[in-house]
Curated annotation (Swiss-Prot):
GO terms for biological process: translation. This is Small ribosomal subunit protein uS3. Gene3D superfamilies: 3.30.300.20, Ribosomal protein S3, C-terminal domain. The keyword Ribosomal protein applies. Part of the 30S ribosomal subunit. Forms a tight complex with proteins S10 and S14. The keyword Transcription does not apply. Pfam families: KH_2, Ribosomal_S3_C. Keywords: Ribonucleoprotein, Ribosomal protein, RNA-binding, rRNA-binding. Disulfide bonds: none annotated.
Length: 235
């Protein structure tokens, strides 16, 4: 079962929480959900050069708080904050609530599944060998402290006539262990021969406490540096 389902959805409320954090009545739920999807699609399209990893949307009373996790915050902020102000005005037109826009830097993009997948996709679109791109991503993740990583690519690899799937794994990726902190992402690369799907799993360690915010705390620990042995769960 753990090998088939989405690792993030399987671990919601165990060691990870939702990216949309709000409650709405039945009559408003559909409109707010469509608004969330529109905001996410717009941000990923508008800021595709900034390496957007996650977009978290919270809705306290009559407000909309959007937090963008990015590997290159300077690209979004721009010179003297000009670009982020323009982005804020565009997003504000998509919602009737008061908008608050926050930018959070991803200090270790090599440990973020979405950013690793985007990097591989960009290399494939530049005609880099898929084996070289996969191996480079795996080596960088392990060098930065990941305990395990798996990368799958599927499609007309290298321009082959018949589509196939190739994968590369290093370390442990325990998909059946609920306390395992596993980041997952699916990205598509638009090559001259067609679409190539890229799936990335990154195992960062085990989270022992059952708290929706535990995953965010663990991610912050990884960004700040490795903890000494014996200071928490298994390393």
């Amino acid at each position: 079962m753990g090998n088939k389902v989405n690792p993030i959805g399987m671990r919601l409320q165990v060691n990870r929480t939702w990216d949309s954090r709000w409650y709405a009545d039945t009559k408003d739920y559909g409109d707010l959900l469509l608004e969330d999807l529109a905001i996410r699609d717009f941000i990923k399209k508008e800021c595709h050069q900034a390496g957007v990893a996650r977009v978290i949307i919270e809705r306290p009373h009559k407000k909309c708080r959007v937090t963008i996790h990015t590997a290159r915050p300077g690209v979004i902020i721009g010179k003297k904050g000009a670009d982020i102000e323009g982005l804020r005005q565009k997003i504000a037109k998509m919602t009737a609530s008061e908008l608050h826009l926050n930018i959070v830097e991803v200090r270790k993009p090599e440990l973020d599944a979405a950013l690793v997948g985007e990097s591989i996709a960009q290399q494939l679109e530049r005609r880099v060998s898929f084996r070289r791109a996969m191996k480079r991503a795996v080596q960088n993740a392990m060098r930065m402290g990941a305990l395990g990583i798996r990368v799958n690519v599927a499609g007309r690899l290298g321009g082959a006539e018949i589509a196939r799937t190739e994968w590369y794994r290093e370390g442990r990726v325990p998909l059946h262990t609920l306390r395992a902190d596993i980041d997952y992402a699916h990205v598509e690369a638009a090559t001259a021969y067609g679409i190539i799907g890229i799936k990335t799993w990154i195992f960062k360690g085990e989270i022992m406490e059952h708290d929706p915010a535990a995953r965010d705390r663990k991610a912050q620990e990884l960004q700040d540096g490795p903890a000494p042995r014996g200071a928490g769960g298994r390393r």
